[in-house]
Amino acid sequence: MKKKLIIFSSIAIISIILFIILAAIVNNDITVPLKIDTSVRDFFYDIRGNKGDFLYYFNRILTELASKYAVIIIGIIIIILTKLDNKAISYAIGALLMILINYVLKDIYQRERPVEALRWIIETDYSFPSGHATSSGFMFMFLAYFLYDSNYKKVIKIIGYVLCGILVIFVPMTRLIFGVHYITDIVGGLLNGIFAASISIILMIIFKEFKIFDKPILVSLYEYIKRDKQEGNKGPEGEEKSE
């Protein structure tokens, strides 16, 4: 337990420090994109092809894997798999933290998105940090640890790790292809997502060690309802009521 806590606490601290440094650089002149932002933006504009071709529709699907709906769906799946145990509780806390951080930071920095004429999709909120990148960093890091801490077969875990590794890179990249974010928005979002995932994993480790929410809440609720129903069917002396 101690080793894991040190590892993920370190990851959380490092991600915060790196974000603070990045945010300071971006905020130095929030109205002017950095050179790396314009260079990466122009690169993706050159390779993305035309709106309406295969790459466009493929990325429309891919980008939804980090939408708010995806965060909710993953949460529901985790609840179903765990029957609402400490893993599901940890995910919910991390997801709420992620949403709060992203909302507050966007409002603080108020960075405008890239040129509207070159965007492939409509986005109305601020640019820094990227919400989709934040969701990607959070979900795919959490899911990787969820697999690590599970009893699934090794081959399933390996496939899951590979998929998480691929998606955490390519899903945020769709935001560059659509022209709605700069690369620094993406990096900032990933750092925030990694921080939120680290907090979730730390909570999961602590909950598991001290047996907090150890018994799935849905199982406990079912047993309580069943027991209450059985007691309700008994008479005053503990005998079953006759129909």
Task: Give the label of every model feature segment.
Residues 50-62, 94, 98, 120-124, ...:
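Short juxtamembrane and helix-loop transition motifs at transmembrane-helix boundaries
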Residues 18, 22, 101, 105, ...:
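Alpha-helical membrane-inserting segments
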Residues 6-11, 86-94, 156-163:
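Alpha-helical transmembrane segments of integral membrane proteins
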Residues 19-21, 98-105, 166-175:
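Aromatic-anchored segments of alpha-helical transmembrane domains
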Residues 1-68, 108-120:
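N-terminal transmembrane-helix/juxtamembrane module of multi-pass inner/ER membrane proteins
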